[in-house]
Structures are given as C-alpha cells and as structure tokens.
Amino acid sequence: IGSAGCGPTAMAIEISTLTGETVTPKMTADYSIEHGEYVSGQGTSHSFPANAARHWGLSVKRVGKNRMSEVVQSLKQGKLVVVICAPNTISGSSGHYIVLTGVDAQGYITIADPGSRSRTGKVYSVDTIQSYGRNLEDGAFWIIGK
C-alpha cells in the first residue's frame, strides 16, 4: 500500500466517511487485487473508484474537468469526490488519487491526500483542483454519495 496505495486509501476514506463503517485501505486494496483493479507497477485502475463505491453500496458519477460546478455542488450536498491527478501536479511524476472533502465559505475546496498528511485539510481553489485532474475522456472526478 505504501508505494501504490493512494487509490485504495482514497476509497477507504470515502467509504468509511459515507457509510459509517470501518473500511481500511487493506480492505479496499484486497478488493482491487481480487477484482483485477490493481495494475502492477502502476497502481489501481481508473475503473476502481466506481467499482469499489458500488461494491460498498454507494452511488457514483464520473465527470470531467469541464464539470467543476457539478463537483462543487456535490461537495456542498455532502458528497465526496475522488480525483485522479495528473503527474507532476500535486505529487511526483506519476498519477495520484486524492479526495475532495468539502467547500469552505470562500469557495475553496478542502482535500484529504492519502500520500501527505501535510496536504490533508488544506484548501485549494477550484481552478487549481481542475488543473490537477487528468485529461481523461471519461473524466478524472468521481462524485460519490450515499
């Protein structure tokens, strides 16, 4: 989990928060391996967030970078959002999953970063978060709710 566990950790954060159940990164990592969602040397696949959310009984909607108003509105409604960040944005030279946890009174987005306690709880502008998202045809943002 240490070297390629941001996806399972991000999903454990979301699932535990939204369901009230204790779901650990090991549990979500095991799920990813058992269901072919782990890609050796790369981490978890881009289908993993949606499949894991559904497995634990949550709703999920995948959207692109052009739908940030929907992302912000979903956060205001109490949903959480997983983002697959592009390389060389929020961390290192590879992609990285983070969790968007809310929006403050000034419209900044709060994050939980599975790879950085120092970034967890910090706020970022909508434009910055949008720029971090990967340019994927199916979208880099998974809106997850109950």
Q: Where are the regions that the model predicts?
A:
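Cysteine-nucleophile protease catalytic domains, especially the papain-like/related folds used
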Residues: 1-62
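Catalytic nucleophile-His microenvironment captured as a short glycine-rich beta-strand/loop
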Residues: 6, 80-118
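Loop/turn elements at helix/coil->beta-strand transitions in domains of secreted/extracellular proteins
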Residues: 55-61, 77-81, 105-108, 137-138
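Conserved beta-strand termini and adjacent loop/short-helix elements that scaffold enzyme active sites
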Residues: 63-65, 114
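Short acidic active-site motifs
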Residues: 67-71
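Short amphipathic alpha-helix with an adjacent loop that forms part of the alpha/beta core around
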Residues: 72-76
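Noncatalytic regulatory segments and standalone regulatory/sensor domains
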Residues: 103-146
